[in-house]
Amino acid sequence: MSTKIEQLEFQAETRQLLDLMIHSVYSNKDSFLRELISNASDALDKLRLEAFRNKELHVDTSDLHVEIEVDAEKRTLTVRDNGIGMSHDEVVDLIGTLAKSGTADLRRKLKEAKDAAASEELIGQFGIGFYSTFMVADKVTLLTRKAGESEATRWESSGEATYTIEAVDDAPQGSSVTLHLKPEDAEDHLHDYTSERKIKELVKRYSDFIAWPIRMNVERTVPAEGDGEDEVTTTSETINSMKALWARSKDDVSEDEYKEFYKHIAHAWDDPLEVIPMKAEGTFEFQALLFIPSHAPFDLFMRDGKTGVQLYVKRVFIMDDCDQLMPEYLRFVKGVVDAQDLSLNVSREILQQDRQIRAIRRRLTKKVLTTIKDLKTERPDDYRTFWAEFGRAVKEGLMSDTDNRDVLLGISSFASTHSEEELTSLEDYVARMKDGQEQIFYATGESRQLLESSPHMEAFRAKGFEVLLLTDPVDEMWVGAVPEFDGKSFQSIAKGEVDLDTEEDKKAHESEREEQEKDFAGLLSWMADALSEQVKEVRLSTRLTTSPACIVGDAFSMSPALERMYRASGQPVPVTKRILELNPTHPLVTGLREAHGERNEDPALGETAELLYGMALLAEGGELEDPARFTTMLANRLARTV
């Protein structure tokens, strides 16, 4: 049948959209194939539903599929389906008009009808993905015949102001979209889309879990027997797995399948530590399959490190590294989230900040934290492995996630003076606290060895008080952000004044303490003047037993390590002076007191004060402001003793 070819103009909005599609909307030109396959999958879903509802529609639904065909010589790529197809009017309405989506209309009708049997996985809700083809094609041809009708429609456009449309005979049911591809251009990210390898790569990345088979004719060389020539054969091959493990019941998935899937999406060589399947129903429906890895990735603490969660919408891949679905401190979690309905931008590549995303994020976070809690209780060995790999990252949440802070404190573990081998929970620490103890004592520093040998530790060790030993950089941050645990506040052993005595001890030592304050008043005043550039105060210590001196901060001052971290990151840090504490029972301090009383004008006493301050600074792992001066004074002092 010969028919008239109509030439029509795009609406003004559509012309603007085409320009946006080609130059602005999509960050990756490869996305066009995802859009075409999504539309084809949508058409197959529609046909299956229509055949179920309309008993007068006699169509074969036994082999519904998507087919990809390439012609390297003609530089064409065709995506074909045997789905519902479109009529002439629908082609004009859906393709010639901006963002008019047949799928969106169908879903609205189904929702109004409340037909439970029609809960189909329809994904063509965006309405304009078809236009993405003009990013890679100079001309696009659509051939489509609606199921149950005899006449087909051919639509063709070069992406300019007009398109042509005509009625044709002898077209198969369904739709085929043929792209006349632009030349390859590496700078413009135009690849060889007739390459079998490239097509398989894109299908694997974007459409591997589409429920329908995606087929492609592939050439294979069959070696000849004897001296004959090798034979080249063409066979149809299904190039997608169709295995959306997250959509299956946990009982129907084997452990090996989970492991294989994890290695596929995480690009991992080892097995996951934990598998977390999840299905949420209600206001926001989604399915998720998450994994806790066995080992931390090398870039876990790098600024540009990637998150591990992929986002799908109705089995269609949307994006890698979807940081909006998981808090940053859980960035090590790998997996897939498949949402039923999300507000996306027109390219499906950027999520809009809306309550759906926030709701999904809350559910995922709660599920992961509950899993870690169960791991700690039921599988302590696996928990220890997890904490060694990811504990530093989890503790970041103590600062940022106030809603889940109590849960995070509960699943955290810390080194302490209670055991050299085992970590402790805060719950166990509190259970071991002494009668009358109202604070959780902690020390921060670069290593356990440095902390245990610190002068600040002496009184706590002598009196049997347990101290948390915090050696991760993040520890310097969260202890200042978390007010308390189980009604017990956190107290640094290197800040403020320490009161470890019982009421009986205080009464017994009260007169002795008053006598010491009186005896050392002159020395303390003199040293405060002599070291006024370095310290804000010199006082007697209640935390020292064997060391002559130590340096402490005010109760709410920033630790030296935290100051160094801020300076290293380029942030301004105000200059703060700390407090020098003296041990009133140490021979060096008592000798200095006596010497000061006898010859307070002796210049050597000033050097002794500087040496005492420098020794205290080094003992806590600090840095001398003038190491050369310190070593010169120390060498001169040692020379006089030889």
From Swiss-Prot:
Compartment list: Cytoplasm
Family, per entry: Belongs to the heat shock protein 90 family.
GO molecular function: ATP binding; ATP hydrolysis activity; ATP-dependent protein folding chaperone; unfolded protein binding
Major localization class: cytoplasm
Source species taxonomy: Bacteria, Bacillati, Actinomycetota, Actinomycetes, Mycobacteriales
A cellular component term, taken from the record's GO annotations: cytoplasm
Species, as recorded: Rhodococcus jostii (strain RHA1)
Subunit comment: Homodimer.
PANTHER family linked: HEAT SHOCK PROTEIN 90 FAMILY MEMBER
Function: Molecular chaperone. Has ATPase activity.
C: annotated span: 565-642
Protein name: Chaperone protein HtpG
Region B, residue ranges: 349-564
Pfam families found in the cross-reference section: HATPase_c_3 (PF13589), HSP90 (PF00183)
